[in-house]
């Protein structure tokens, strides 16, 4: 059996291809999962596809493009990697930030140097690997969330809803001040629920104390999928929620076409943090002062109060 002898330049070239492929595959996995987790909420298919490519798949596309350029034109591709690393560090970090130097600039300079010196042979095989593995990762990781999102039900009912099941019966506020489309801090969410009018349409100048934030247990027990209660149970000792059926971003609790995927709950972890619930049922502690657009709230009141 003939022994294959690789030159140093071949080893360097294939090492560069392997690193590029690994990074692109990681971004393919992350991007397609995040796309269907927090993205894909527009009513327009064009907007959903555009957001997917521009925001979630762009890191994979960048690394794929750089790898293909470097395989075909090693020195141009090597310089492109260096410029990309410097540009990303400049855009994403403070120029004097050591994290930027260690996690972005130096790795990209190193990868660029490997492509500059290396010569992966045969190039055609290198191209197929650099493109094929990330695309395979993209498809394999994207099938389940794509099918799940495509199968979501939506009844276009954004009014106040009585949700009864799993030992919990509550009225969940209608779209508006009691159920907004943008995020607020935990303290602001608590304040708004306290000031929300009885009909849930406006905020009063003084606390009405009709509405409130749901507790973690109430939110977990109310979760559903395809209008079937998910059988959620909240273990306060381990801070873990368990379900018989995995919940999803569907009515009566969630708005399919809203960017909001997390809700504040009334349950505090400590003075600085409170628990939030995700549409898929997970529960995480977050600092009360943060207010990203995708973290909002939905006020609740006892169902008996609606009579």
Q: Which residues are covered by each model-predicted region?
A:
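Aromatic-anchored segments of alpha-helical transmembrane domains
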Residues: 23-30, 82-94, 137-144
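An exposed tryptophan-centered "aromatic clamp" motif
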Residues: 194, 198-208, 216-276
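Internal/C-terminal transmembrane anchor helices
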Residues: 124-150
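Hydrophobic cores of alpha-helical transmembrane segments in multi-pass inner/ER membrane proteins
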Residues: 59-68, 103-116
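Extracellular adhesion/carbohydrate-recognition regions
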Residues: 148-211, 296
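Cytosolic-side transmembrane helix boundary signature
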Residues: 107-133
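Short, structured beta-strand segments at or near domain termini in extracellular proteins/domains
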Residues: 262-264, 285-307
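Central hydrophobic cores of alpha-helical transmembrane segments
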Residues: 74-88, 130-133
